[in-house]
C-alpha cells in the first residue's frame, strides 16, 4: 500500500490524448497542403517538414503516456485501453508521415484526383478522431457518451467512402496509366492513404469500447 501511495493516482491522460489528437490533425492538414502545392518544390518541402514535426511531437506524447501508465497507481480508464488507444493513434501519425515520405521518394509526376480525394477523407477522419478523443474525459454525461459514439460512426462512414475511392482509383490506374513505374508509385500512395482511414477506424473502435465500458 505504501508503494501505491507514492505513485500519482490518475495522471493527466485525457489531456495527453487531446494533445496527440491535435498533432495528428496538424500532420494531416500539412500533408493536405503538400498535396495541394505539390508542383511548388519549396512549399512541398516545407509542408513535408511540418508533417515530420507534427509526427515527432505526437511520438513524444505517446512515449510520455506509455511511461505514465507504469508510474500511475490508479488510471481513469483501463491501462490496456490507454495503451491501445495512444499507440493506435500514433500509428495514424506514422502513416501520415510515411505517405509524405513516399511521395517525396517516388517523385510522382503529378497529383491525381484520387490522391486529393483520399487525402481529404484522411483529414476528415483525423478531425473526427480529435473530436471523439476530446469527449473521453466527460463520459459521465450520457449525452457526451452518445456524441462520442456518433462521431465514431462518422469515422466508419468516412473509411467506407475511402474504400470506394480506393477501388475506383485502382481500377482507373490499371486501365488508363501506360507507365508501369507510375502505376507502382501511385498504387503504393493510394494504399497508404487508404490505410490512414483504416487506422482511424481502428482508433474509433477503441474509443467505442472505452465509451461502452465507462459510461
Q: Where are the language model's segments positioned?
A:
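Cytosolic, long alpha-helical scaffolding segments
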Residues: 1-215
